[in-house]
Amino acid sequence: RRQINELIKFTNNRNLWVNLSRLTLTYMDKGGENEVFHDGKVSVIKLNNFEYAGDDLENFFIRITVHNKFFSNVPYQMIGFAYNSEQKFCAVLIQPYILAEREATEDEIAAYMQALGFKMDYYDEYHNEDYEVFDAAPNNVLYGIDGNLYFIDTQIRLKS
């Protein structure tokens, strides 16, 4: 909680607030950590409440950086901070909106992750020397109309 309070102070001092009421957004979905909206054009906006960051917010920032390293075809861009519908402090993230043919299969995900140098631990969990990727399940990986895979909502952490 202390880190959240420090980040709120940082946001205030640097005027990093995103005024969501000025954006034309359509609600799409809500999960454990994200409220997801579409801008009607080419982007998905996620309000991430840091739920899965644990006690150290650095985990969140590592996750975003590593996601962009391995899954650069659907990168996160953090544009600021806001409060969500439950009045929880959130990072405001933008990702490209993906035109998907379907969800990726477990076999497609496994082949993709192995090509990146990851080893499978479980059907939706992988690791390499430095990182663990989990929740790489079909509902979080899209098979695009272009035939590419898009990892839109996986969890990543430093390997312990």
Each model region followed by its residue ranges:
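Protein kinase-like catalytic core scaffold
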Residues: 43, 91-93, 132, 150
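Active-site ExK catalytic segment of metal-dependent nucleases
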Residues: 44-51, 96-98, 153-155
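Electrostatic, structured charged patches in enzyme active sites and in nucleic-acid/phosphate-binding
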Residues: 59-75, 89, 143-145, 153-155
